[in-house]
C-alpha cells in the first residue's frame, strides 16, 4: 500500500469534495484527467425518488475499493486512481461517488475510469435504499459478490489482472 | 460457542434486526451459522445470493468460526 493511500477513508459520511482528490493525484507526467461523478437521480425504473440512504460495511468496503484502485493502476498502466463513496442520507443531486484517474493519455484514462467505477458498483459492499414520495422505501437490487457468481459480460472483456 | 450475525442491506429488513446472536457447536462453519436462518422464509430466499465476511475479510461457507466472531451477511450490492 502506498503511503499516501492512508490519508483518508474511501467511505465518507460527509458531502464529497473533488478538490482533495485532484490535489492528491496531481502529477506532471499525466496529460489526461478523467473524472466520474455519480449523483442521485429523482427517478428509478419509472418511479419518482425523493432521496436515498446508502449503507456500507465500512472496513470491507475500504479494503475492496483500495484493491480496485490498485487493480486499475496495474491493469491499465495508469499512475493514479482514487475512488470515494458517500454513505448516509443523500438528496437529489448529491454526489454519491467520485472516481478520478490520471494517465499520460486519454484512451487509457477513459478505459481505466470505467473499470474503476463499474468495479466499485459491482464489488464494494454498499447498499442503496430508495425512498419514494409516499414515504415507502425499497433496497435496489444489485450484484452478488459471493464466489461463484459470474461478473457482467462487459467486465469480463476488460484486461485480467496478470499477477493473481 | 456464540457468534453474532450482522445483517446488511435488505437482509437487515428481512431479519427484523441488524444483529442476531446464535449459539453453535464447536468446529461450526459459516454454513452451519447460515443454516440456522433457513427457517425464516423471507430471509432464506435471499441467502443464496449473499456473501459472508468476518471483519474486513470475505469468507467461504466452509470457513471455521471462532467464539465471538462477528459474521456479516452481505446481500447483492448496489453502490454508485
Task: State what each model feature region is.
Chain B
Residues 1-79:
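Ubiquitin-like/PB1-type beta-grasp interaction modules and other compact soluble beta-rich domains
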